[in-house]
Amino acid sequence: MKWLLRLLAITLPIFIAESAGAVGFQYLSIPDDTGRPIELGIWYPSNSITAPTTLGDVAQTVAVNGEIAGDHLPMVIFSHGSAGRFTDRSESALVLAKAGFVAVSLTYPGDNYKDSGDKVVQILLNRPRQTSRVLDYMMQTWPGRDHLEKSEIGFYGFSAGGFTGLVAIGGTPDWKLFPVHCAADPLEGVCQQGSAAVLSRPQVAARPVSEWQHDARIKAAVLVSPGWAFSFDPSSLSKIKIPVELWGGSEDHVVPFESNVGYLQRYLPHVIAVHDVKDARHYSFLKPCSEAARALNLEICSDQPGFDRVAFQESLNRDLVRFFRSELATDK
């Protein structure tokens, strides 16, 4: 469905309802380990004057390059799904910034709405590395780094971003499990994609586990419809010690609940909460579509009859603030 994501990216901006509290925003680019640009959006508390601003495919009232307000600020990094972009969780980033967090979201080189040309194995290997590269920048080079509480780093990942998060917090894929699962459940969404044949090859399963980059700086994670979760080595999952919150949809046929969220619930030792969202489809976890996008009847904009995506997203954002406030507090 990558073409749907690309099409959504060029639709009219979505204007997000604002509440009290000023938010600053910075847009910049840093190189990954191969020199390709990683696009970043950074939201943070600010006392500077705000103005309506277009940020890619969304519009928000923010203080572009405004001064940072506060010290010892916790940070949450956002990881988009396949062929996404840094604005995919822009409303969540805004809400977290208003609540006193720094929120940073990246666009993954080789797996985004403009360029998804990397091969699937390379994408899955690169994503955790690029995530760590962003954390390196934020904590070592970003001009606002002295405002951060560097021991309070959270992660949010959707779909392929959920896979990225599982690797980052210590999980190791065992690709021998992939063809076994797909043979038993061929209707699993990722088993029907073109990449399934690649991930089922013996040479993929034989790749060394040392290729997967973990990042111990992440202290709490929210994983939403985490893709390929059933292919993770249970023993590696059992060693993950940080708190994790899991979300999935009862009508998600791309990343079905039981074989992914349910699988992780069985093996992760510190699952704080599991949310099986009634009537939610895979794309129900993305921000609400603009009217122009909905008029095109895109699958990415389609929800079950009666499912209120706007109300659900507001509830999800409130929970993100609650979870990260609770689990990132160093004095809890």
Ranges and model annotations:
Residues 21-78, 88, 273:
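Domain-level recognition of soluble alpha/beta enzyme cores
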Residues 50, 65-73, 78-115, 230, ...:
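Short substrate-entry loop that stabilizes the transition state in hydrolases
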Residues 120-146, 150, 167, 176-194, ...:
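Alpha/beta-hydrolase active-site loop
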Residues 157-161, 165:
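Gly/Ala-rich beta-loop-alpha elbow adjacent to hydrolase catalytic centers
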Residues 236, 242, 256-266, 289:
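Short alpha-helix in the alpha/beta-hydrolase fold that links the catalytic acid
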Residues 240, 246-248:
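Short beta-strand/loop motif that positions the catalytic acidic residue
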Residues 267-298:
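Catalytic histidine neighborhood in serine/cysteine hydrolases
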Residues 291-332:
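Catalytic active-site module of serine/aspartate enzymes centered on a nucleophile-bearing elbow/loop
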